[in-house]
Amino acid sequence: MPVVMARDLEETASSSEDEDLANQEDHPCIMWTGGCRRIPVLVFHAEAILTKDNNIRVIGERYHLSYKIVRTDSRLVRSILTAHGFHEVHPSSTDYNLMWTGSHLKPFLLRTLSEAQKVNHFPRSYELTRKDRLYKNIIRMQHTHGFKAFHILPQTFLLPAEYAEFCNSYSKDRGPWIVKPVASSRGRGVYLINNPNQISLEENILVSRYINNPLLIDDFKFDVRLYVLVTSYDPLVIYLYEEGLARFATVRYDQGSKNIRNQFMHLTNYSVNKKSGDYVSCDDPEVEDYGNKWSMSAMLRYLKQEGKDTTALMAHVEDLIIKTIISAELAIATACKTFVPHRSSCFELYGFDVLIDNTLKPWLLEVNLSPSLACDAPLDLKIKASMISDMFTVVGFVCQDPAQRTSNRSIYPSFESSRRNPFQKPQRTRPLSASDAEMKNLVASAREKVPGKLGGSVLGLSMEEIKVLRRVKEENDRRGGFIRIFPTSETWEIYGSYLEHKTSMNYMLATRLFQDRGNPRRSLLTGRARVSTEGAPELKVESMNSKAKLHAALYERKLLSLEVRKRRRRSGRLRAMRPKYPVIAQPAEMNIKTETESEEEEEVGLDNDDEEQEASQEESAGSLGENQAKYTPSLTVIVENSPRDNAMKVAEWTNKGEPCCKIEAQEPESKFNLMQILQDNGNLSKVQARLAFSAYLQHVQIRLTKDSGGQTLSPSWAAKEDEQMELVVRFLKRASSNLQHSLRMVLPSRRLALLERRRILAHQLGDFIGVYNKETEQMAEKKSKKKLEEEEEDGVNAESFQEFIRQASEAELEEVLTFYTQKNKSASVFLGTHSKSSKNSSSYSDSGAKGDHPETIQEVKIKQPKQQQATEIHADKLSRFTTSSGKEAKLVYTNCSSFCSPAAVLLQRLPSSHLSSVITTSALSAGPGHHASLSQIPPAVPSLPHQPALLLSPVPDNAPPSIHSGTQNVSPAGLPRCRSGSYTIGPFSSFQSAAHIYSQKLSRPSSAKAAGSCHPHKHHSGIAKTQKEGEDVSLNRRYNQSLVTAELQRLAEKQAARQYSPASHISLLTQQVTNLNLASSVINRSSASTPPTLRPVISPSGPTWSIQPDLHASETHSSPPGSRSLQTGGFAWEGEVENNAYSKTTGVVPQHKYHPTAGSYQLHFALQQLEQQKLQSRQLLDQSRARHQAIFGSQTLPNSSLWTMNNGPGCRISSATTGGQKPNTLPQKVVAPPNSSTLVSKPASNHKQVLRKPASQRASKGSSAEGQLNGLQSSLNPAAFMPITNSTGSLEAPQVIFARSKPLPTQSGALATVIGQRKSKSVKSGTI
């Protein structure tokens, strides 16, 4: 904010300023520091380079923070600074907060720095980064403290000065040597020799003994790039970043001298190996152990799995780093004291290259002044962006406008200067200076606290020492992914004596931070320091302290990607969980506990949120997100539970800055290590395995969602994404067929844009997960009801498992699921087998046994045979019913056991005026393993657009039931086989139930466990029984579950006791339906009686289609006389009824294979025309009818269509087609529900004769079928059953039977009652 505004607001102490400060205190990019917590320091977030969040930029823009980059080009640094509101200034400008340079700094430039300005190099840092100076410093330390204490470099000689010594050493050991220029990088000028004559002495070079026993991974040599941050040389403060890079050679290692010139084998520099044709790059940031560049944590995890002691290895690495920096500490600290006006002005990031031999001893290769920050792979970006962001946070950029330079004034300003600093918190009454206030606070708190605590003895410290002590502690609070390796209580005892820069700051820092260590530990550390001074002993695991083990666990954990943190920030969970870097609320509270105890609590805690990689679409954290609310478990618990991979997550901070004594009193909380439990003969229950699989699928859905935008659409990326989406599509196709519940698959077409396909696929995967979770819950409820105690014993602790699922990453879940699958030798528990397989305990009965609501209409997928896939027709709208590959068709059914009478209860609740016509086509299968399909229907007609709303939404109380007809398929035997796909869910009997009642002697159902079958054994007879039960319920207007169950069981036992003949219940039915001439009748009657909003269209998909017309349109539409007459009575064709009943009874099988004729195609084309002309006048429809009658006049159609229509609101239309031959005799009867119409063929001109004919035929009908019905017919009053045959038993002209919905007292009087009712109402049949 402007300076004037800051002054005015401070003087007036306005409420707006207080609100602004309150907002800043809560800002995720602000941490308040200083004695009174009035100095804002910027906190960096690596994910900001992806989110472009204005909330992150606003702080930098408000304070006009700026930077300049000199003699280098780092896109990563520029991107991170720009994302946080920094703006770049000219390299010659002096108004900047950060100067990032790629070269050493001149002394005059350092002298001009203000305390708020920072540069990324120390003066004389070449003492470390030049190979000759590093060698000289190490040699000096070896001479001073012993060769073994600083034996961190291979044997080295500086040529040409030490050429004679080199030749002398070579004569003793003629192994290979490596030559390096003293001031080069990236492997330039490096080569191997095996003879001194091969060396050129024209320039200064370094010759080192080649380490010919390197540690190999898969026979490849590698080294490790470590990132070391030094924030001060006086006192010396060293941080090591928890993540690094393992760089591999591209040629397998061979010690033979013939390969000595092969740089791709012996050099591991990325700049060298990237030129190799064998270089492999990994494009997935989540995969860290693939290709020629691994993460250091992945390398450590691999070594740990191989049985290597990674704790000792990393302890050796820390030892090497500390000794290396100490060797140059004197020269650099002296230069800083001479040239740098402020202790906090400089910082430096070093790149340590370390080679590990096969004894796990690390060797220092070189130290890089400006380690490469190029991001050539996603893994580079993840590691380096996190590291740079954490480094900037540790360094601490004060939010101060660089134009308001205070020169050499203290950052803790006087009263006058504070009025000009906008970042300073206002205070109404202030002492002489902020520093004095800090001192008084410290002294006052020291007097109040118990002696022996840290804050109790600040007396005697100078102002400068107090500020240094506070700054070091605040840096440690902001360290993020950096680990302070010096000073710590252990490293100070070991390496303190090596420091050569004898100032009071190092000693003060150590004594104030670690003064109250316990006597036993102090004696142990003193002994270690003494032995180390005498001979630099080998570091062993037995002597490792707790902090070393914790550090090893930190190095092994996996760093979270930027995308993960981006999703968390987007969901707002980062601020909701905790402030990023909690600060002690009052300065006095830092006196409660010693720095040593505080550090232990901060570093020992477990970071639970590090493992939250995508438990839902937003559940992941970034590397900065590692610093969540902390816990303080004991060391033994942490070490015992540290996983092989990266489950160990260590916290960095105390919880919300609360006093450490409160945290100390908390109970230790151990980390739940699921993989360890599984490896120790533990196991998951089936429900737990499904929960883990569901969480894994949610991670996959997150990846699909997050990548749907913001990507560079390169061909390689598009090909990769297409391949991954294809895997998900194949999974959904296979897995959805195993679901017991319905699932509508709308898989995206490959013609769509890539990002649109990802969006649709992510949505479909989400739907699948929802249904999958429902089934898992039902499984859990079912097991809990049955009290399966063995399942509980097999599973792990439920609460711990839920916590693991919530926090686990995708990689961890994948590892657990893979191990579980291998252990149980099956993955069927995740998806099960075919839930609708042909078993008696199929999902038809299972789904209804769960107590689901009977009003829920669901969708079932039927897997089609492979021979039919080629002919399956796929339109865009057709995908609502079938998957994009055509392997699955769908069928709507009520969610009850075996389609039983709960559906009738639904219809009882519906008003009679809203009941749609209910009629179904019998399509029972005549052979095992054959499914319904209408794939032979031509693809000319589009499917109806209103389908999804019907299929997905539950049926309301005032909505009529849907009739869903099945499909047919040609069997290998050449017979038209049909599976029942049409079920009447109403209280009135349907065509199928009537056929069953009048035949009674049906053939054995033939769906016996055929490959790909999705129907139970007793599916067909069970359907008829269900219809029967439904009628009973409708008659009594009540639903009795026990009565229905008993009746179903009784009928099933009677049916099973009969002798069945194979394939006799379908043959003549299919023959008769195919011989009906529907060309004129369907067109005529649909045009005459059907309102435009209800006229049907045949879908090329062939399963079932239903539409829900506009209620207003259907209610207000004026119906023609024929339509009104249809509302008063039901129609059915006599000949078809007789044919179908006879075919069920006799079981005559047709002898020729069904082949659709041209007439059937023309019929469907006519129906398509009707759909397209539904809003036109009746005159146009009559013309269309006449045209098609002329076409089909001389042809016999092999298909017939049964149309169910109703003019009432909310009615639904269903259709089915079947094919077959014309039978000889046609004993059959049908009953149509009220307010329904069956339009099959053109009726005869004399309707009264049609009505009288069934009465005379009834006497000649065989009594065997009726005798079996006498016990049940009395309960079926709502419908009239009228068998119709002619004298010859063959089909004559199509006839119509009218069945009333009013209950009839007896079956014998049904016909007379119907005729009497129609006469009394004077209903004219007319042309329909």
Swiss-Prot record:
Organism name: Mus musculus
Binding site for a protein: R186
Compositional bias (Polar residues): 420-432, 1116-1128, 1214-1227, 1234-1248, 1257-1271
EC class: ligase
Compositional bias ranges of the Acidic residues kind: 597-617
Disulfide bonds: none
GO molecular function annotation: ATP binding; metal ion binding; protein-glutamic acid ligase activity, elongating; protein-glutamic acid ligase activity, initiating; tubulin-glutamic acid ligase activity
Ranges where the TTL domain occurs: 62-407
Catalysed transformations (reactions): L-glutamyl-[protein] + L-glutamate + ATP = gamma-L-glutamyl-L-glutamyl-[protein] + ADP + phosphate + H(+); (L-glutamyl)(n)-gamma-L-glutamyl-L-glutamyl-[protein] + L-glutamate + ATP = (L-glutamyl)(n+1)-gamma-L-glutamyl-L-glutamyl-[protein] + ADP + phosphate + H(+)
Residues the entry annotates as binding Mg(2+) 2: E366, N368
EC number from the UniProt entry: 6.3.2.-
Binding-site list for Mg(2+) 1: D353, E366
Residue ranges, compositional bias (Low complexity): 838-847
Main location: other
Domain notes: The flexible c-MTBD (cationic microtubule binding domain) region mediates binding to microtubules. It is positively charged and becomes ordered when bound to microtubules: it interacts with a negatively charged patch on tubulin. The presence of positive charges in the c-MTBD region is essential for proper binding. Arg-186 is the main determinant for regioselectivity, which segregates between initiases and elongases in all tubulin--tyrosine ligase family. A glutamine residue at this position is found in elongases TTLL6, TTLL9, TTLL11, TTLL13, TTLL10 and favors glutamate-chain elongation, whereas an arginine residue is found in initiases TTLL2, TTLL4, TTLL5, TTLL3, TTLL8 and favors initiation.
Protein name per Swiss-Prot or TrEMBL: Tubulin polyglutamylase TTLL5
Keywords, in A-Z order: ATP-binding, Cell projection, Cilium, Cytoplasm, Cytoskeleton, Ligase, Magnesium, Metal-binding, Microtubule, Nucleotide-binding, Nucleus, Transcription
Gene3D superfamilies: ATP-grasp fold, B domain
Function description: Polyglutamylase which modifies tubulin, generating polyglutamate side chains on the gamma-carboxyl group of specific glutamate residues within the C-terminal tail of tubulin. Preferentially mediates ATP-dependent initiation step of the polyglutamylation reaction over the elongation step. Preferentially modifies the alpha-tubulin tail over a beta-tail. Required for CCSAP localization to both polyglutamylated spindle and cilia microtubules.
Oligomeric and partner information: Interacts with the transcriptional coactivators NCOA1/SRC-1 and NCOA2/TIF2.
Site, as annotated: Essential for specifying initiation versus elongation step of the polyglutamylase activity: R186
Superkingdom of this protein's organism: Eukaryota
Spans annotated as Disordered: 1-22, 411-436, 585-631, 834-853, 948-975, 1006-1032, 1085-1129, 1212-1271
Region described as c-MTBD region: spans on this chain: 378-488
Cellular component GO terms held in the UniProt record: 9+0 non-motile cilium; ciliary basal body; cilium; cytoplasm; microtubule; nucleus
